[in-house]
Amino acid sequence: MLLGSLLAQYEEELIAVGEEAESLSFAYRALKNWTFTDFVLALQKEVEEEDQTLLLSIFEQLKHHVPAQYIIGSAEFCGHVFTVDERVLIPRPETEELVALILEENDEEALRVLDIGTGSGAIAISIALARPNWQIQASDVSEEALALAHENAQQLEAVVSFKSSDVLDDLEGPYDLIVSNPPYISRDDVEEVGANVLASEPHLALFADRDGYAIYEKIARQAPSVLTPEAKVYLEIGYKQGNKVKELFQKAFPDKQVRVLKDQFGQDRMVVVDNGSH
């Protein structure tokens, strides 16, 4: 059978179970290490038996809601390729916007930075590579996630120190900047989560108690004691959480400015705590 015909057959079945059809060709090309041109040229060729087996394997995993990034074992973030598996969340494009904002609003001056809930290490490592003179620390409550983040730092030659901690329980600071993309989905909103996310990605990194606000509340309680006077806090939030998270941090930092910023899709996505000037 021609590759194009086999892909079309599998893609139709993936759509029927609510998966994105493009994930199949994306994963296949990645595992074959093909360019897009290689892929296009192969569409009208017969599929070798070995490749039929590979395609079937990818299809079966996608059909059972395994994300394509887990199948290929990597995800791109801020121009870098990170190893990902079931130990960590797959980095999202929205989080790239958070990193870009931090780099845009903070110049080359050396800062002490903490990434809370680092997961794959995507935020901390991307910042470390862009600002090599900053002192970057990254924490997570999951030892498995920290192990993978450490692997990513080594692979990408980023200088980041990793620490096991539940938010700031085992951290002392002082820090000039805290960034976090914490678990923020309420357990009541489980129906809003995609099937592949729910089936494969770690729930510890997805869901938070107290309607999704538990980690924000803990950061707001603990951060004032470990931050320098000029320090800033950058948070990713759920699209419905802007007002509540802003209120939490305005109470925790009454003398600072708290901003809610939108992502590229026009949804509330980031909260920034600083001394003003923006």
Predicted regions and their residues:
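N-terminal auxiliary segments of SAM/dcSAM-dependent transferases
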Residues: 1-72
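A general structural signal for well-ordered alpha-helical segments in protein cores
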Residues: 7, 24-27, 55, 68, ...
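Alpha-helical elements of Rossmann-like donor-binding domains used by nucleotide-donor carbohydrate transfer enzymes
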Residues: 9, 26, 54-57, 97, ...
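Alpha-helical structural context
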Residues: 30-31, 105, 130, 252
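A secondary-structure boundary/capping signal
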Residues: 43, 73, 85-86, 164, ...
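An acidic site on a long C-lobe helix of protein kinase domains
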Residues: 51, 91-94, 215
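S-adenosylmethionine
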Residues: 133-135, 139-276
